[in-house]
């Protein structure tokens, strides 16, 4: 193929791409000034009692607002005109589900306004709270209390301060997870690339799984703590696992400060491990090519630390 022909093809492709972008932007801003009006708000008053909550949405943020008093619970939904949600109470469960009436033209353009669902509910003990969203954030304050809380968002963040009795489970793909002030029997947090922050929490079992995001724990008490990460770092401060602490990483570093556990097991591939325990430990530390420096004690709980190329330093 001649050089001129190649250049002409490249120019044509660039022009087609540029024209497509300009067309999309033109369609988007052609109705500039009316975009905000397309966000419609509706308020639904709930007259039936419910003990469980089930929310299944797409791009909406979900926010819980507890209140004291005799007012009826209600839901306020701000959404685009061609997207709607059904709100009803069935068999003691408040169910909010997305109904998508959009056509392909509605997906063209840029929507700056974020849609959201705000649930105003009485302060009481609920049996179950389940929320699923795709790109929306989920926010539950500390005044919300439920035996079971299950939260899932793909790219949205999860911010939970609620009191969970038996189970609190938070799962995201790229969104961050922030949990504080919870006291469930079982706590499960899982993310792919999002960061995890767990603070001021007391639980029986805590299981954390992350891929590339960072994992931070501060002021946490439990009996069993397992933490698994790939390339993300793990940082523990003022964490007490009364029976067992286990941390696995690939390339992520592990730092443990002012923390303690009955038995400790830490394994990394290339990640460094360092820190300080509040009580004496019987260290069994080994690294193939990394530097190892740990206290030479033979008392206290067993602390097994292994790494391939990472350094191991404990004071």
Where are the regions that the model predicts?
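Acidic (Asp/Glu) and glycine-rich low-complexity loops/linkers
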Residues: 2-57, 61-133, 137-153, 159-172, ...
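Extended ligand-binding clefts on enzyme/binding-domain cores
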Residues: 231, 251
């Amino acid at each position: 193929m001649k050089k001129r022909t190649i250049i002409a093809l490249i120019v044509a492709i660039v022009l087609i791409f540029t024209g497509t972008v300009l067309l999309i932007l033109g369609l988007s801003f052609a109705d500039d000034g009316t975009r905000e009006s397309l966000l419609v708000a509706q308020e639904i008053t709930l007259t039936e009692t419910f003990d469980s909550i089930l929310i299944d949405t797409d791009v909406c943020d979900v926010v819980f607002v507890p209140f004291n008093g005799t007012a009826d619970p209600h839901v306020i939904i701000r959404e685009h005109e061609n997207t709607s949600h059904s709100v009803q109470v069935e068999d003691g469960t408040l169910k909010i589900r997305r109904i998508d009436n959009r056509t392909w033209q509605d997906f063209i353009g840029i929507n700056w306004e974020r849609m959201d669902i705000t649930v105003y509910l009485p302060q009481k003990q609920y049996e179950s709270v389940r929320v699923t969203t795709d790109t929306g954030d989920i926010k539950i304050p500390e005044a919300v209390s439920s035996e079971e809380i299950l939260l899932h968002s793909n790219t949205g963040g999860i911010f939970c301060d609620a009191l969970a009795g038996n189970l609190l489970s938070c799962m995201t793909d790229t969104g961050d997870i922030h949990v504080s002030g919870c006291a469930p029997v079982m706590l499960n947090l899982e993310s792919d690339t999002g960061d995890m922050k767990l603070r001021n929490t007391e639980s029986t079992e805590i299981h954390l799984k992350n891929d590339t995001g960072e994992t931070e724990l501060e002021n946490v008490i439990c009996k069993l703590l397992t933490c698994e990460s790939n390339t993300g770092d793990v940082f523990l401060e003022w964490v007490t696992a009364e029976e067992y602490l286990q941390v696995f990483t690939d390339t992520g570093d592990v730092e443990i400060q002012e923390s303690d556990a009955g038995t400790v097991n830490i394994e990394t591939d290339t990640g460094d491990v360092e820190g300080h325990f509040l009580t004496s430990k019987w260290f069994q530390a080994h690294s193939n090519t990394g530097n190892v420096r740990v206290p030479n004690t033979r008392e206290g709980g067993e602390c097994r630390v292994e790494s391939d190329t990472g350094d191991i330093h404990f004071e």
